[in-house]
């Protein structure tokens, strides 16, 4: 039996995920720049939606890259 993953944001009592907190957002992005799914990270549906929105805003404002590198 595997241990059930716990939502880090619920434990910390976070009200909203801030798009300016780039260091926290980087933990939920793969090396290729994709958003890690909640079944892997264990985040609840509420915070996964906020996380996706925050990552997309940070990408739009060039705080985070859309992808890791470009191939020719």
Swiss-Prot record:
One of its GO terms (molecular function) is structural constituent of ribosome. Gene3D superfamilies: Ribosomal protein S18 (4.10.640.10). InterPro entries: Ribosomal_bS18 (IPR001648), Ribosomal_bS18_CS (IPR018275), Ribosomal_bS18_sf (IPR036870). GO terms for biological process: translation. Binds as a heterodimer with protein bS6 to the central domain of the 16S rRNA, where it helps stabilize the platform of the 30S subunit. Belongs to the bacterial ribosomal protein bS18 family. Part of the 30S ribosomal subunit. Forms a tight heterodimer with protein bS6. This is Small ribosomal subunit protein bS18. It comes from Francisella tularensis subsp. tularensis (strain SCHU S4 / Schu 4). The lineage of its organism: Bacteria, Pseudomonadati, Pseudomonadota, Gammaproteobacteria, Thiotrichales. The gene is rpsR.
């Amino acid at each position: 039996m595997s241990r059930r993953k716990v939502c880090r944001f619920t434990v910390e009592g976070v009200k909203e995920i801030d798009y300016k907190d780039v260091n926290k957002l980087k933990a939920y992005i793969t090396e290729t720049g994709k958003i890690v799914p909640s079944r892997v990270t264990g985040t609840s549906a509420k915070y996964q939606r906020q996380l996706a929105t925050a990552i997309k805003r940070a990408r739009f404002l060039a705080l985070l890259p859309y992808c890791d590198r470009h191939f020719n």
